[in-house]
UniProtKB/Swiss-Prot annotation:
Pathway per the UniProt entry: Amino-acid biosynthesis; L-arginine biosynthesis; carbamoyl phosphate from bicarbonate: step 1/1; Pyrimidine metabolism; UMP biosynthesis via de novo pathway; (S)-dihydroorotate from bicarbonate: step 1/3
Biological process, per Gene Ontology: 'de novo' UMP biosynthetic process; glutamine metabolic process; L-arginine biosynthetic process
Similarity remark: Belongs to the CarB family.
Native source organism of the sequence: Methanosarcina barkeri
Name this polypeptide is given: Carbamoyl phosphate synthase large chain
Annotated gene: carB
The enzyme's E.C. designation: 6.3.4.16, 6.3.5.5
Subunit organization: Composed of two chains; the small (or glutamine) chain promotes the hydrolysis of glutamine to ammonia, which is used by the large (or ammonia) chain to synthesize carbamoyl phosphate. Tetramer of heterodimers (alpha,beta)4.
């Protein structure tokens, strides 16, 4: 009706029907029970065998409890929008670009205001779809819309006519009390009468980072996916992405090292993007090491580093080095079953030995940018949130 693109999808009430729907859409697909919170029992499945396992182990499907099956947009950038609508006008509080790609639960992904890599054309699509959806739903108050961008095209994943968990972050980032505005709209005020008609345009960069509880969960693998695992959030603000991201990681107690050793063990799908990350880390003076496959790949692209044994090949390996406090950062994105077992042990050891760790390539790219900025001698801005808001107010008066 609105002409807003969304990923192809369907639902199933039996295993046979689920396989038929998935084949029609094409793997990989995102599967979940028909009503879940926090991504509970949500999973990305890559083939028919994986789907059969999910149907048997993860959910009980029936006519009363169907499962939803959607096309999974691989390598897409996920976007969150928080807005207020009074059934006539719509004000966008902020467009948030997720650091992690689509596939990591929105509650577990770091995100940035304003977006750093989305084109003006994509942002215009996001604004257009937000207004169309909010007005068509006759929303009176807050609405949160999740979208994904792939190849310059924006898809709407879901629209929730309610407050979202990002409202406190957005309000602090842009200096506008969205919940208060929405409450006044609900009781009859218009956005125009309240003086809020324009989308805020902050000059500073705000990063939301999550707090993960794995240090309280012995043995749990700290890997991110469609099921939400975080239990809190922190925020970093500065005048560029690098410093804001560094502050956010500092607040999350995942302090990015400016000296020392970095261990790399990356799945094949991520290796193309790894080259630039490795070059930035090496140029920043960090010493790199990794497993044989990663080391050989980077050597072909002019980045040379030390080889460390895989965990299943025996000692000395990276876990031994963490135990001796010889590793300052772990970057690990596993894929195969053996690598997954090794990766799980490495990530768990990083939590246990309190070594900063990264499990997605997008977070590695962000971390490399932050380290590069800090190594250039950039000073962290020490300023209250009120001072950032005052600067925005003064700019808007001009």
């Amino acid at each position: 009706k609105l002409g807003v693109p969304q990923p192809e999808g369907g639902y199933a009430t039996s295993q046979k029907e689920a396989i038929e729907v998935a084949k029609r859409i094409g793997f990989p697909v995102l599967v979940r029970p028909s009503y879940v919170l926090g991504g509970r029992a949500m999973e990305i499945v890559y083939d028919e065998m994986d789907l059969e396992r999910y149907m048997k182990e993860a959910v009980r499907v029936s006519h009363e409890h169907p499962i939803l099956i959607d096309d999974f947009l691989e390598a897409a950038s996920e976007i969150d929008v928080d807005a207020v609508c009074d059934q006539k006008d719509v004000i966008i509080g902020a467009i948030m670009e997720h650091i992690e790609e689509a596939g990591v639960h929105s509650g577990d992904s770091a995100c940035v205001i304003p977006p750093q890599s989305l084109s003006p054309e994509v942002l215009d699509q996001v604004r257009d779809y937000t207004r169309k959806i909010a007005l068509a739903l006759r929303v009176k108050g807050l609405i949160n819309i999740q979208m994904a961008e792939k190849g310059g095209k924006v898809y709407v994943l879901e629209a929730n006519p309610r407050s979202s968990r990002t409202i406190p972050f957005v309000s602090k980032a842009v200096g506008i009390p969205l919940a208060k505005i929405a409450a006044k709209v609900i009781v009859g005020h218009s956005l125009k009468s309240l003086g809020y008609m324009d989308e805020p345009k902050p000059k500073h960069v705000s990063i939301k980072e999550v707090l993960l509880p794995f240090d309280k969960l012995p043995g749990a693998d700290p890997v991110l996916g469609p099921e939400m695992k975080s239990t809190g959030e922190v925020m970093g603000i500065d005048y560029d992405f690098g410093r804001a991201y560094y502050k956010a990681e500092l607040a999350a107690d995942n302090v990015l090292p400016l000296t020392g050793k970095v261990f790399l063990s990356i799945r094949n799908a991520d290796k193309t993007e790894l080259v630039d990350v490795a070059k930035k880390l090496q140029a920043a003076g960090l010493e790199l090491m990794g497993t044989e496959g990663t080391v050989n790949y980077l050597a072909q692209h002019g980045v040379f580093m030390d080889v460390v044994k895989k965990v299943h090949d025996g000692s000395p390996n990276v876990i031994d080095m963490m135990r001796r406090d010889e590793v300052n950062l772990i970057i690990n994105t596993p894929t195969s079953k053996q690598s997954r077992r090794d990766g799980s042990r490495i990530r768990r050891a990083a939590v246990d030995f309190k070594v900063p760790y990264i499990t997605t390539m997008q977070a590695a790219i962000a971390a490399a940018a932050a380290i590069e900025t800090m190594k250039k001698g950039e000073e962290l801005t020490i300023k209250s949130i009120n001072e950032y808001h005052k600067e925005m107010e003064e700019e808007n008066k001009v």
